[in-house]
Structures are given as C-alpha cells and as structure tokens.
C-alpha cells in the first residue's frame, strides 16, 4: 500500500500508510519527490517536516520512505564548498538552474566528476580498525586524509591507488565490504570518539579582549549575543581568519539573504594568514537564509556540526560558527506550532533548552579513533530582539555554553572594535586555562588580568560619580584611574580588524602590552602620591605612545616596551626632582 498525504500545514505534512517508517527517516513527499524527514509517529501515521517549499502539494499525493535517516556526504572536496541546510551544493545548482532553485532539485554534495590521486598508507593483509587513516587524496594543491568509516573493521584484501572519483571503492575487505573516498553519516548522530580530553588548552582567537579576559578552551563553547549593528559578523570573520583553527565551518542559519550574499562575496577575497591563499580554501559554508524553507534551517546546524566532526576525526582543530542560533530557535518554534505542541516561554517549545544543550555537547577536544587529537569549538551568535539578554534563547544558551562574549551597541556606536562588553561578559574556563597562559605567555598573566579587571571596574564606579559632580571635582588619583582605564580600553582592548599587524595578537605580545599599561599606571599612582601633579604626567604625551603599541610587530614589542619604560622613569624622576 502506498502512503498518502492526509494533512498539509506549511512545512509540516501528515501521511497515512507509513507503518514501517522510523523516526528521523527521510521520506520523498509528493509527485515532485520533495525531501522530508519523519519527526513523529502514531501507528501507521507519520508527521513529516519538508525541507522544501510545500506550496502546490495536494492531499492524496504519495509519500515514499527511503529507509535511511537524513545524512550528509563526507569526503574530499568539502573545503571551499557552499551548501544549503540539507547539503545541496549551491554552486552546482546555480550553474544548472540559475539564481532561483526549483523544487525537487537534486545533485550529489561531492563532485563525482572530480578525480583524486590516492596515495594509500595501508597494504593488503593489514587489519583495518574503525577511523584509521587509509592514505592521502590529492587534487591540485588540495590534500586530504582518507578515513575508514567508524563502524568498519576487518582484514584488507585489496587496495587501489591512482586517480579515483569519490564514489569509487579504494579498499576491499576480506568479507567483501568496500570503502570509497566518501562516506555518509546521519546528521543527528554524533560521530564516535575514543575518549574526551581535558579542556586545558585555549582556543586562541587573536583578539586580546577574548584571549586575555574571557578565554575559551579548544573544544569549548562560546555564545556571542548582540543586537543589530554590533559587529557579530565582523567578529566571526576575524575569528575565521585569525583563530587557531585548521578548518572553519560557517553556518549562516536564517540570516537575511543580503547578509549571506555579502559573506559569500567577501570570503573569497579574504587572505588566509597561514597559507597566503584565499580563506575559502579552509572553509566550508552552510547557507540557509531566512527566505529558504524554515525546516531546512532547523537541520542546517546539524549538517554543519557533522561536517566539523568529520574534520575533527582527521586530527584537526575545527571552529564551527553558527550565525545565528536565534533564527534556528525560531524555526523550532514554527515547527512546534505546526505540530500543535504546548508552547513554553515566548512561544518557544519547552524542549528548546535540551535541544540547544544536546547540540553544544557535540563540541569537545577529543582523542579520535585513529588520527590522534582533534577538537570542535562552537561559537554561536545570538540575535536577541532589541538586545534583550533575558529572552529564552539567550538564557538557554547561557546555561549550555562556557563563555559569554556580549557585544554592546554603545561600544559599537563609539567605533570600539571588538565591541565586547567586559562588564557583562564572562568565561567559566578562565581559571582552568590560567596555568597554560602562565606557562606559554609568561608568569603573572592571571594576576595582571585580575588587576586590569579591577581597574576597569573602578572606572565604572568613578564615571557614575563624575556624571554627578563633574570630572574637575575628582582628586588627581581618581582622574588618573579614568585616564589609565581609557588608555587600557583604547590601546589594549580595542583592535583594528583592518590593521595587518593589530588584527591578530599572540598571547606573549598581549601580556607585554598589559604589563606595560599596568606598570605605567602603578608608577603614576606613586608619583601622584609623592606630590607630582597629574597634568604634568599627561602633558608628557606617553599616552599616545602607549596607544600605538598594538601596531608594533610581536618580535619588536619587548624593545618598544623597554624604551617606553625608560622614558617614563626619566620623566617621573625629573618631575619628582622638581
């Protein structure tokens, strides 16, 4: 008996006669064979969310189960590709159909015509273990390890080499099983690992305010809430360019089409500081704009996460950028409403927190099955309406992530980039990572960080007083706090994304800059206590020199800092003598 549609409600349809279907199984819906996924089963009646536009579907049209869950293709050729939320290759579809895609469009995610030169690292007679590296596949300048699927083991009977397509078998086992360059994996099932490793190595972003004040571990999770115009996209582009990640997976989930078009236009022009080639060469884009079907938006973050886990299994460090989880949650809300489920706060489903937590738990630094150590670090942008951080998506994300990098509209309007609000932001991993920074960046890192945070907190208190009584009414020591905090904000916390030197800052350089800022403040405090007037110190112009430290290369920062220290000592000695 053929299953037939009995109800259609937007992206959600109901079909009778699917008694043998499984939850999360792919179903071909209607005469045009639209892609759908089973999300609820009641006897032989299945509720299906359709990943394409359902306008024009009619009751009584067929629904055909595929027997497989929603899965993605993993293999050589992923890097530099642009997919939609269910891994259809947008470049290839645009070449075939033009700018607007028709319904039922199908193309394999990986190019079957492209040939890869295989250099095997296994031989006939070897015992194959799950996740083992079988060799390297090369095509032009691109080279990628070939992994055995996680569920396959046995004795190798045959190994092929030479130019192969991704769907051709490269290894045949004694039991007849064949392994090709590509493998398929269900998007909602995490890929297996050997064991998780301690999160005691930082995910270096190159941004001083994040690395020094609110660090996140490699394999950790961070959320970036911010309203319109606060710089979420620019920050994520900077992270993609300068963070310590071998591969970047960028998921544009439900953002406006023109914003995604801008990202697609800008990324090929950005230069990768590591290789000198285009940044797109180590990036995978999963694009699902707000005018695409809402159900595919819900699947897109799982597609991106599965691709990230595949590169992690090669022993690589992967940064997974989600922009934004708010749009994903809105898709959940719409699907939940179509299912007539009981709504929670602001109409979001009651399982929003558990779904978010389950997704963020797929991050981690791990020992892979066969390729050593790898990590997936997830950075999720949140777009709270009106910048309200008390709304449900922000609050659920707070409970599931290890760091909050809150973007401030006020700082963004003052041209302060990155516009990270140090009064709201926090990191649960800062203390755990302190030991690494003390070893690798230099002793005293944690103490300097704490001292700088106290200085910024003291500034906030004094600003409130100054707004009431005026800056002139403050004592010299209090006005010095305001001036030192201003220099710290503008010279240390602010970075230019367009300065080739200051765009990324290594930890040792950041430590030297922070130490110098706080040393100058401490010496000035002592000088004022000894009777030196504040205006005499400010007129010397050392502040302007301090603001230019960020533009010094890392190897020259120590020399520049010593010269500034010597100049300060000479100035204060002369002022104290007077």
Swiss-Prot record:
Its EC number is 7.1.2.2. The keyword Acetylation does not apply. Keywords: ATP synthesis, ATP-binding, Hydrogen ion transport, Ion transport, Nucleotide-binding, Translocase, Transport. Transmembrane segments: none annotated. The keyword Zinc does not apply. One of its GO terms (cellular component) is proton-transporting ATP synthase complex. PROSITE patterns: ATPASE_ALPHA_BETA (PS00152). One of its GO terms (biological process) is proton motive force-driven plasma membrane ATP synthesis. It catalyses: ATP + H2O + 4 H(+)(in) = ADP + phosphate + 5 H(+)(out). One of its GO terms (molecular function) is ATP binding. ATP binds at residues 226-233. Signal peptide: none annotated. It holds the Pfam family ATP-synt_ab_Xtn. InterPro entries: ATP-synt_VA_C (IPR055190), ATP-synth_a_Xtn (IPR031686), ATP_synth_asu-like_sf (IPR023366), ATPase_a/bsu_AS (IPR020003), ATPase_F1/V1/A1_a/bsu_N (IPR004100), ATPase_F1/V1/A1_a/bsu_N_sf (IPR036121), ATPase_F1/V1/A1_a/bsu_nucl-bd (IPR000194), ATPase_F1/V1_b/a_C (IPR024034). Belongs to the ATPase alpha/beta chains family. NCBIfam families: PRK04192.1. Produces ATP from ADP in the presence of a proton gradient across the membrane. The V-type alpha chain is a catalytic subunit. This is V-type ATP synthase alpha chain. It comes from Anaeromyxobacter sp. (strain Fw109-5).
């Amino acid at each position: 008996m053929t299953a037939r549609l009995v109800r259609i409600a937007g992206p959600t349809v109901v079909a009778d006669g699917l008694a043998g279907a499984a939850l999360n199984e792919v179903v071909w819906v209607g005469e045009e064979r639209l892609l759908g996924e089973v999300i609820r089963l009641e006897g032989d009646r299945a509720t299906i969310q359709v990943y394409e536009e359902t306008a024009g579907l009619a009751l009584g049209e067929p629904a055909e189960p595929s027997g497989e869950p929603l899965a993605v293709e993993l293999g050589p050729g992923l890097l530099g590709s642009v997919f939609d939320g269910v891994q259809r290759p947008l470049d290839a579809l645009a070449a075939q159909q033009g700018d607007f895609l028709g319904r039922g469009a199908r193309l394999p995610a990986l190019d079957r015509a492209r040939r890869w030169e295989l250099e095997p690292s296994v031989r006939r007679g070897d015992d194959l273990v799950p996740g083992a590296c079988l060799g390297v596949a090369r095509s032009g300048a691109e080279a990628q390890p070939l992994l055995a699927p996680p569920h396959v083991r046995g004795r190798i009977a045959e190994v092929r080499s030479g130019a192969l397509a991704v769907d051709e078998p490269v290894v045949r086992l004694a039991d007849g099983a064949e392994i090709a360059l590509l493998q398929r994996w269900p998007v909602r099932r995490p890929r297996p690992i050997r064991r998780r490793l301690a999160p005691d190595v930082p995910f270096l972003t190159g941004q001083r305010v994040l690395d020094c004040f609110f660090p996140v571990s490699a394999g950790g999770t961070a959320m970036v809430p911010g309203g319109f115009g606060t710089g979420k996209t620019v920050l994520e582009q900077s992270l993609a360019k300068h963070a310590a990640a071998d591969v970047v997976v960028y998921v544009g989930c439900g953002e406006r089409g023109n914003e995604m078009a801008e990202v697609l236009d800008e990324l090929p022009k950005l230069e990768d500081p590591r290789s000198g080639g285009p940044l797109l060469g180590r990036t995978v884009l999963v694009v699902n704009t707000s005018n695409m079907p809402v159900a595919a938006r819900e699947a897109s973050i799982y597609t991106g996460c599965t691709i990230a886990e595949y590169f992690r299994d090669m022993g690589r460090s992967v940064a997974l950028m989600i922009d934004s989880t708010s749009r994903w949650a809105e898709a959940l809300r719409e699907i939940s409403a179509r299912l007539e489920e009981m709504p929670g706060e602001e109409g979001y489903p009651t399982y929003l927190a558990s779904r978010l937590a389950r997704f963020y738990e797929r991050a981690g630094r791990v020992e892979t099955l066969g390729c050593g150590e790898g990590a997936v670090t997830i950075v999720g942008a949140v777009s709270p309406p009106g910048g309200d951080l008390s709304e449900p998506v922000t609050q659920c994300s707070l409970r599931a992530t290890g760091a909050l990098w809150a973007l401030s509209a006020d700082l963004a309007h003052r041209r302060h980039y990155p516009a990270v609000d140090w009064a709201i932001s926090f990191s649960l991993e800062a203390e755990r990572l302190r030991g690494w920074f003390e070893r690798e960046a230099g002793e005293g890192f944690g103490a300097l960080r704490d001292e700088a945070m106290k200085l910024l907190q003291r500034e906030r208190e004094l600003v409130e007083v100054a707004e009431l009584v005026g800056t002139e009414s403050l004592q010299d020591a209090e006005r010095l706090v305001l001036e030192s905090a201003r220099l710290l904000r503008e010279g240390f916390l602010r970075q230019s994304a367009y300065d080739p030197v200051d765009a990324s800052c290594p930890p040792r350089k950041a430590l030297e800059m922070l130490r110098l800022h706080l040393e100058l403040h401490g010496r000035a405090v002592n000088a004022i206590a000894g009777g030196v007037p504040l205006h005499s110190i400010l007129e010397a112009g050392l502040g302007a020199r301090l603001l230019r430290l960020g533009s010094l290369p890392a190897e020259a920062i120590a020399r520049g800092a010593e010269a500034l220290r010597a100049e300060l000592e000479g100035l204060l000695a002369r002022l104290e003598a007077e």
